[in-house]
Each structure stands twice: as C-alpha cells, then as structure tokens.
A protein has these predicted regions:
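Short, acidic/polar
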Residues: 1-7, 151-158, 264-271
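Internal, glycine-rich beta/alpha segment that forms the wall or movable "lid"
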Residues: 58-165, 177-180, 184, 192
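Short, well-ordered coil/turn segments that N-cap beta-strands
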Residues: 13-15, 42-47, 72-78, 116-118, ...
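N-terminal beta1-alpha1-beta2 module of alpha/beta enzyme domains
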Residues: 1-48, 144
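An alpha-helical appendage that flanks or caps ligand/catalytic pockets
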Residues: 10, 101-135, 177-279, 311-318
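Conserved, mostly hydrophobic/aromatic
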Residues: 20, 38, 69, 111, ...
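Glycine-rich, proline-tolerant flexible connector loops at the mouths of alpha/beta enzymes
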Residues: 15-38, 53, 85, 172-174, ...
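Acidic (Asp/Glu)-rich catalytic clusters
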Residues: 9, 35-43, 66, 70-76, ...
Length: 318
C-alpha cells in the first residue's frame, strides 16, 4: 500500500484515500498510520481517510492523529468522516447500534469544534465533557479539510449541507445520474443555510480498474469484484450476488464502475463529472484478489493516461 501511495504521487494523481475497517477481509484498521508512512517519500499527493468511522472513534484522538499526518506531510492531510460500510466497530469498541444516529451527530460536531477552537469547551452526552483543555498538535492547514461521506441518504445529505461541509457520495451501483437530485438538494439547502457555494463541494467515489487492453480489464476485474459483492450479499439482505449481466451493466456507459482501457475510463469519468457537477472524483482501484503488480499498473495508467485526458478536457472547456 505504501508503494501504491508513492506511485500515485509519482504519476501525478491528486489524492490517495484509505478506509477504516475492522474485518479479516480488509487490511487497514488505522488509516492515519498508513497515511503517515505514505507521507514520508511523497511530495504533492493529498492523503485522506475513506472513511474514518467517527461514531466509534474519539474525536480528540482523530483530530490529533490527522493533525500529525498533516505535519508530517507538510499540509496534505484530510479527514473523510463517515458511519462506515460495516458495523463491526460498534461492539468491538463498546458502542450500541441503537445509538447509531446520536453517536455520529455528536462526534461529528465535536471534531468540528476541535478544528475551530484550540481550547476545547465541550459538554457531551455520548462523548466526554472537556472544560478548557487544549487539543494538540494543531493541523498545519488553517482550514483543515473535513469531508463527510454518505451512500446517498437524503437526511444525511441535508444534514451535511446544513453544516456547509463538503460531501462525498459512494456511487458503487445503479446509474450515477440518479444522484443528481441529491446533489442539487445538497447545494440548494446549503445555500439556504447561509453557506457560500464555493464551500459546498461534491465528490464521488466509485470502483474501477484500468488496463491497456479493454477486454482484459473487464475480464480480470469481474471475479475479484464478484467475490466481494457476493460476500457482502451473504451479510446484507438488500445486496444480491453479482451476475455477469449485472456486471456488464455496471461497466457499461450508464453504470457505476469505471473499467476498461484508459480512453474508455477517461470518457466515463468526464461524463460523471459533467452530469453531476463534481468537484472531485475518486476511483477505488485495488479490490479483492487483484495481484499487486496489476494494481500498480492500473495506478500508473490512471495517472499517466487517464488523468491527463480528463484534465485537458476540462482545461479546454474552460
């Protein structure tokens, strides 16, 4: 993973983000530790969690840890807050799922207060109360970036908009265009609550894979993706095992997966950015059992071939 971060920086990609998981089938439980290691030999790439499960973390420690990454990286760290795709962290750290909403809301508010004020005064119900204590170290960046991720829940969208925080949509199924009403509502509600439109940034995160040969990419990506989806489908009633037909739709022009050769993937990225009015697009490349050397090649193609096509298109468009 450190090699991936260093390569992503070398080929000129903008950001590398790592998720927090507490399962046998995922490698990282503490993204900030890996990001700190990735900061050492990189110069430009931004380093983010994707996501930090704030509901089952201590907001003070989350801020301190990422402020440390920000110092090591000379101001390149970001936090992406979320509830997380899985619930293992709740019993693991002694939290109840019955407090799901309250934990997320209070802890998100607490870390925003920590970002705003060096000296923390806080009365908590699901968090500790703090009376005039400093939280250190402070982030290098004056307005330390905190994004909030959601799978497309309307209430979450409006809550994030009300706070004027940048939002990240996990678009991993269906037609990405279905998210347009949510994005429009986010921007409208954010402005109604007095937030400057320039701060109401929208990002999307989707799965994908790139190879020089389109057919190779599509065939190679299927089985690792199916394996992951099928595993989740055994745990969640609203998921179903992936068929080849479903996969073909997902990698097609109206699907949510970005798989193919560099030109195909670039064209599809341009399409989603334009249709949804995105400020940032993040492609989740490594998944399941894809060999490490193939993941590195995909990152290389993303940085050297896909990204230049996308950047040139929007540069020419003005």
């Amino acid at each position: 993973m450190i090699e991936e971060i260093e390569l992503a920086d070398k080929v000129g990609l903008d950001i590398y983000a790592i998720g927090e998981h507490h399962r046998k089938d995922f490698a990282v439980s503490a993204p900030e530790i890996v990001l700190a290691a990735g900061a050492v030999n990189t110069k430009n790439i931004r380093l983010s969690s994707a996501t930090t499960n704030i509901s089952t973390n201590d907001p003070v420690r989350v801020y301190q840890n990422f402020a440390t990454v920000d110092a090591i990286s000379n101001g390149r760290a970001e936090i992406m807050l979320g509830r997380g795709s899985f619930t293992e962290s709740f019993p693991l750290f002694g939290y109840s799922l019955s407090d799901y909403e309250e934990l997320f809301t209070e802890k998100m508010d607490m870390i925003l207060e920590i970002r705003k004020n060096e000296i923390l005064n806080w009365k908590g119900s699901f968090t500790q109360s703090v009376d005039g204590r400093g939280v250190y170290p402070r982030a290098v960046q004056k307005d330390f970036p905190i994004w909030v991720a959601t799978g497309g829940n309307v209430e979450s969208t409006l809550r994030i908009a009300e706070k004027g925080l940048p939002i990240v949509y996990a678009i991993i199924g269906g037609n990405p265009l279905n998210f347009k009403p949510l994005i429009d509502a986010y921007r409208k509600f954010g402005k109604q609550n007095g937030h400057d439109e320039k701060h109401l940034k929208v990002a999307a995160h989707s799965w994908g894979y790139i190879a020089e040969n389109s057919e190779k990419a599509k065939k190679q990506y299927f089985h690792p993706t199916k394996s992951l989806v099928d595993q989740i489908s055994r745990e969640r009633a609203h998921w179903s095992e992936m068929t080849w037909e479903q996969y073909e739709y997902s990698i097609g022009p109206n699907g949510a997966m970005f798989v193919g050769n560099p030109e195909e993937v670039a064209k599809k990225i341009i399409k989603i950015i334009e249709e949804l009015g995105l400020d940032r697009f993040m492609l989740h490349l490594p998944i399941g059992s894809i060999p490490h050397e193939d993941v590195l090649k995909s990152i290389e193609l993303y940085g050297t071939k896909v990204a230049p096509i996308v950047r040139e298109y929007f540069r020419n468009k003005g």
